[in-house]
Amino acid sequence: MCATPVSPTPLPSTTPLTLRWRGSEPYEASFEAMRTFTDERTADTPDEIWLVEHPPVFTLGQAGNPAHLLAADSGIPLVKVDRGGQITYHGPGQVVAYLLLDLRRRKLMVRELVTRIEQAVIDTLAAYNLAGERKAGAPGIYVAPGPDVGLHAGAKIAALGLKIRNGCSYHGVSLNVNMDLRPFLAINPCGYAGLETVDMATLGVAAGWDDVARTFAERLTANLDGSPAAVAQPQAGVLTA
């Protein structure tokens, strides 16, 4: 376990933050929508967080090595994208949060943003009596050692990758809730051979996607804006924090 980065307590923000529930959506549709949103935003465009669940897809970061896809005949499409990081898998039962933020307006450095996203994951896991931890040099969140996690200590439960364009972020973070984990065996997750990937259900959490998505949205809002605003149950449409 590495030391927890120290991040200043976020102050209540006056910057509007909109939470959008996009439902189950093909990855390519979300990817193109993120790029379009970022290209077209102005200095006055409110920041947004999108909550999404994707059909099965592998995504490979802009500097990613295709050799980390170990089974090219898996039947799962591979999409090359412009985020940082290597290869990961998205699929049903995973909460994906895309963060479309104006970092200059929020006076956020990229490292601080990553720290706050990671803390939101840790806080979300804690709400379900799970302990998560960071690993130095390996963005994302991993299962902390404990009496109830057995051999899953050190397994990755959340992956993170961002793109910064003109001072604005897109892409984001994925949290494994209740998934078919077998596709992760077809890759070196995030470029690490033999890295175990786990979900909350495997660790004994019975909560479903909607419940975890709502909790995660609350924790993201609290870590970004400094106020634990209540977030309504995810549903089609717009939720404003």
Curated annotation (Swiss-Prot):
Pathway entry: Protein modification; protein lipoylation via endogenous pathway; protein N(6)-(lipoyl)lysine from octanoyl-[acyl-carrier-protein]: step 1/2
Keywords linked to the UniProt accession: Acyltransferase, Cytoplasm, Transferase
EC number: 2.3.1.181
GO biological process, one term: protein modification process
Pfam families (UniProt xref): LplA-B_cat (PF21948)
Compartment list: Cytoplasm
One cellular component (GO) term of this entry: cytoplasm
GO molecular function, one term: lipoyl(octanoyl) transferase activity
Stated family: Belongs to the LipB family.
Miscellaneous: In the reaction, the free carboxyl group of octanoic acid is attached via an amide linkage to the epsilon-amino group of a specific lysine residue of lipoyl domains of lipoate-dependent enzymes.
HAMAP family in the cross-refs: LipB
Record's protein name: Octanoyltransferase
